[in-house]
């Protein structure tokens, strides 16, 4: 029976179509793909055993499970993963790589000390990242790469000690940033918040801040919490750039002084909370530039109710007539303690107008220069404004292109023009009235002569009379008095004598200012001098090399002369004798015996005397002059 059931391999290869289709390669591939899809679906629908899953595995809760690392088996469909209150210390690279749909990741209240670079790879859709109540000591900037959709980042209550520049520049999409309760924070860089141009909410509460950090890059910030810090004073410019800020909380920040114009940059502010501080007074008209301010909290401050607080009482009546709980009560003097500030009136006090202790002084300047008109009152609680010559009232924050009122009341001109000439009035105000002081600004037009290599000199000369012409034929004329004016290129030469008719003519001369060389001319001259020096040096070097080579060649020729024969031809004057062809010229006697064989001089027809070897020649005054030329073959000598 078994043999009948068994198929031979050949039967399988050549059997019916059914058997061939059973082993079709395409069918095998399709089956494999189905298995992979099923496996993926199984993984996508799995839930870690220690966690609870809901909403078709899109919500995974693993709270208080004593986990030391991110568990395996999390569904790829997960959109919310809560790992709150576990024992996780390190977030390793690619821990969430397969969770491409994850939107909210909660890692708060663990023991996280390290977040590796690339730990959040694959979380392209992550919207919220909670890391508060951990043990991070630095901002894990490198781990934020590729979180292009991150909107909220919670880092509250970590032992972070400093926030460096560009700490969050990798997540420009961020809208909410919670940095509260960084109790070990000691340093915030000037560029710490660079790149967060889309941030709407920033929490810096309880961070041991002693001054407000640079918040200028946060141009779209709506809400700012600075509560629980040590901000003893709020100064002008602290909120520069926060034109869209609507809510400002500075609760229990130990604020003692808010200087004049400190809030002028907060044009959109709707709510401000200054409760639980150490404020006693506020500068006059502090809230006047805040046209959108609706809610203010000033309670639990030791307010000193005197003349300087009257403006606040009037402002509260206008802005919040029914809200008596918002604005606190007087602490001093004793007779007013506990009284609501909004109920105060001028009848309670004896007040005086402000005093200007440093009035502005008249000023003479040249067009294009900077200028300042100072105006200082006896107290900083007053407000200062300026009235320009055309009647415009300028206050701090009402900036023009060139003119601005500084926080100390100074009227500053960055670049004066002739049109700025006129009288400026400083007006110092308090709750009682105003005090004014005026000063005149005189602006002199600057001479703007176009640059020229030539200028015109006007020379006035006199035509001498006939008598003067006879006596001054040999004289040049009256010596003119020359007056060079540095502010004007036109120079006038006036003669001392004015008895004759004047004639004026113009002579173009070289510009006076051209006598002083400019930097460009000096540099050009310096370059020419350096170039000449380098050229001379190179020429000298070349000449030295040529001279050395010629000398060496000449020296070599003297020591290694080529083989040659020298023939000396004597041309005698008329020599008398019987037979010139046979005559001999007697030679003087030679003292040395070994030279006796040179005893005669043969005629030109017999002048080839061959000398085989000569060891040495000794010459003296009494010896004949011998001319010797060395040769490898022949040496020819003669006696003269």
From Swiss-Prot:
Main location: membrane
All copies of domain LRRNT, residue ranges: 45-76
Transmembrane feature ranges: 528-548
Disulfide bonds: 375-426
Region (Disordered): 463-482
Stretches forming LRR repeats: 77-98, 101-122, 125-146, 149-170, 173-195, 198-219, 220-241, 244-265, 268-289
Membrane topology, from the record: Single-pass type I membrane protein
Signal sequence residues: 1-44
Domain LRRCT, first and last residues per copy: 301-353
Highest taxon listed in the record's lineage: Eukaryota
Modified residues (Phosphoserine): 631
CC annotations in GO: glutamatergic synapse; membrane; postsynaptic density membrane; Schaffer collateral - CA1 synapse
Keyword terms: Cell membrane, Disulfide bond, Immunoglobulin domain, Leucine-rich repeat, Membrane, Phosphoprotein, Postsynaptic cell membrane, Repeat, Signal, Synapse, Transmembrane, Transmembrane helix
Pfam families named among the record's database cross-references: I-set, LRR_1, LRR_8
UniProt domain Ig-like C2-type: residue ranges: 354-442
GO biological process: modulation of chemical synaptic transmission; regulation of axonogenesis; synaptic membrane adhesion
Record GO terms (molecular function): cell-cell adhesion mediator activity
SUPFAM superfamilies noted in UniProt: Immunoglobulin, L domain-like
Location of the protein in the cell: Postsynaptic cell membrane
Entry text on domains: The LRR region is both necessary and sufficient for the interaction with NTNG1.
Function of the protein: May promote neurite outgrowth of developing thalamic neurons.
Complex and partners: Interacts with NTNG1 and WHRN.
Entry protein name: Leucine-rich repeat-containing protein 4C
Organism annotation: Mus musculus
């Amino acid at each position: 029976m078994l043999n009948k059931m068994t198929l031979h391999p050949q039967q399988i290869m050549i059997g019916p179509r059914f058997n061939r289709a059973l082993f079709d390669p395409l069918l095998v591939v399709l089956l494999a793909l189905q298995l992979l899809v099923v496996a993926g679906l199984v993984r996508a629908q799995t839930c870690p055993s220690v966690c609870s899953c809901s909403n078709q595995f899109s919500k995974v809760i693993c709270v208080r499970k004593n986990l030391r690392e991110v568990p395996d088996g999390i569904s790829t469909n997960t959109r919310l993963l809560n790992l709150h209150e576990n024992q996780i210390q390190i977030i390793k690279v690619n821990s969430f790589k397969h969770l491409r749909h994850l939107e909210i990741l909660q890692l708060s209240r663990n023991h996280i000390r390290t977040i590796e670079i690339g730990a959040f790879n694959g979380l392209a859709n992550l919207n919220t990242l909670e890391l508060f109540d951990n043990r991070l000591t630095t901002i894990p900037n490198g781990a934020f790469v590729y979180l292009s959709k991150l909107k909220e980042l919670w880092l509250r209550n970590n032992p972070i000690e400093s926030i460096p520049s560009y700490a969050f520049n990798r997540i420009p999409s961020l809208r909410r940033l919670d940095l509260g309760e960084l109790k070990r924070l000691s340093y915030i860089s000037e560029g710490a918040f660079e790149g967060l141009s889309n941030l709407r909410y920033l929490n810096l509460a309880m961070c041991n801040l002693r001054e407000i950090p640079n918040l200028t890059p946060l141009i779209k910030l709506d809400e700012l919490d600075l509560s629980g810090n040590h901000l003893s004073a709020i100064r002008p410019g602290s909120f520069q750039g926060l034109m869209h800020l609507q809510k400002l909380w500075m609760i229990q920040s130990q604020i003692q002084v808010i200087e004049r114009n400190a809030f002028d940059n907060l044009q959109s502010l709707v709510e401000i909370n200054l409760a639980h501080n150490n404020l006693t007074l506020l500068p006059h008209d502090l809230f006047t530039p805040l046209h959108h301010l609706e809610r203010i909290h000033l309670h639990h401050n030791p307010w000193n109710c005197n003349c300087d607080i009257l403006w606040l009482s009037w402002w509260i009546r206008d802005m919040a007539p029914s809200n008596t709980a918002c604005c606190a009560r007087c602490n001093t003097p004793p007779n007013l303690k506990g009284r609501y500030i909004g109920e105060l009136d001028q009848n309670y006090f004896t007040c005086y107008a402000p005093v200007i202790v440093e009035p502005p002084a008249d000023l003479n300047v040249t067009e294009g220069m900077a200028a300042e008109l100072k105006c200082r009152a006896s107290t900083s609680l007053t407000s200062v404004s300026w009235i320009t010559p055309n009647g415009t009232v300028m206050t701090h924050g009402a900036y023009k292109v060139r003119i601005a009122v500084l926080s100390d009341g100074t009227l500053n001109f960055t670049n004066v023009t002739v049109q700025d000439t006129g009288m400026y009035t400083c007006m110092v105000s308090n709750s009682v009235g105003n005090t004014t002081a005026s000063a005149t600004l005189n602006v002199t037009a600057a001479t703007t002569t176009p640059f020229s290599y030539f200028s015109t000199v006007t020379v006035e000369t006199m035509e001498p009379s006939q008598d003067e012409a006879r006596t001054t034929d040999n004289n040049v004329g009256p010596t003119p008095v020359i007056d060079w004016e540095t502010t004007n290129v036109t120079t006038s030469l006036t003669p001392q004598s004015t008895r004759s008719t004047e004639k004026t003519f113009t002579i173009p001369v070289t510009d006076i200012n051209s006598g002083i060389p400019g930097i460009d001319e000096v540099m050009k001259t310096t370059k020419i001098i350096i170039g000449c020096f380098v050229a001379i040096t190179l020429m000298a070097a070349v000449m030295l090399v040529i001279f050395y080579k010629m000398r060496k060649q000449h020296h070599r020729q003297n020591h290694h002369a080529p083989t040659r024969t020298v023939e000396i031809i004597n041309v005698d004057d008329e020599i008398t004798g019987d037979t010139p062809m046979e005559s001999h010229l007697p030679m003087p006697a030679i003292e040395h015996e070994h030279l006796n064989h040179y005893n005669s001089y043969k005629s030109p027809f017999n002048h080839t005397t061959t000398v085989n070897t000569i060891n040495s020649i000794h010459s003296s005054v009494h010896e004949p002059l011998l001319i010797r030329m060395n040769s490898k073959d022949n040496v020819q000598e003669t006696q003269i």
